[in-house]
A protein has these predicted regions:
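Catalytic core of membrane glycerolipid acyltransferases/transacylases, capturing the structured
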Residues: 39-62, 68-71, 78, 85-131
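N-terminal membrane-anchoring alpha-helices
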Residues: 2-74
C-alpha cells in the first residue's frame, strides 16, 4: 500500500509542477520583456555619458543575472580564475537558447564586444542599434 501511495504522490507532485510551470511561463516572458525594455532604455540613455562602457556593462550583467534568476536557472562557472585581465579573448556562443548569452554576460568577467553578420544590420530596429 505504501508503494502505491508513493507512486501516487510522485504523479501528483509532477502534475502540480506542470501546472505551476504552465502558469509561470507566460509571467516569465512578460517579466523578461518588461525588464529588457526598462533596462534597454536606461542603457541607451546612460551610454551617451559613459565613454568607457562600464555602466552599460554593469547594467548588462544585472540584466543577465536577473533574467537567469527569474527563469530559475543557476549558473556555475568553472575555470573563471584562468581568465586574465587586460588580455583579449574571443568568446563564441552557439545560441541554442538565450541562456548562453545571459550566462556569458552575467558570469564571465569580461566586457564583451559583439560581432555579427552584415545581413543582421538590415533587421528593423535591431540593425539601427548596431550603428
Amino acid at each position: 500500500m505504501s508503494k502505491l501511495l508513493g507512486l501516487f504522490m510522485k504523479k501528483l507532485y509532477k502534475a502540480l509542477i506542470e501546472v505551476l510551470y504552465f502558469i509561470y511561463r507566460p509571467v516569465f516572458y512578460v517579466l523578461v520583456v518588461v525588464d529588457t525594455t526598462i533596462l534597454g532604455i536606461l542603457t541607451i540613455a546612460l551610454s551617451f555619458f559613459d565613454p568607457t562602457g562600464n555602466t552599460v556593462h554593469y547594467i548588462g550583467v544585472f540584466w543577465s543575472r536577473l533574467n537567469l534568476f527569474l527563469s530559475g536557472v543557476r549558473v556555475r562557472v568553472h575555470g573563471k580564475e584562468n581568465i586574465k585581465k587586460n588580455q583579449p579573448y574571443i568568446v563564441m556562443m552557439n545560441h541554442q537558447s538565450y541562456y548562453d548569452v545571459w550566462a556569458v554576460i552575467g558570469y564571465i568577467p569580461l566586457q564583451l564586444r559583439w560581432v555579427m553578420k552584415m545581413e543582421l544590420r538590415k533587421v528593423p530596429i535591431f540593425g539601427l542599434g548596431c550603428e
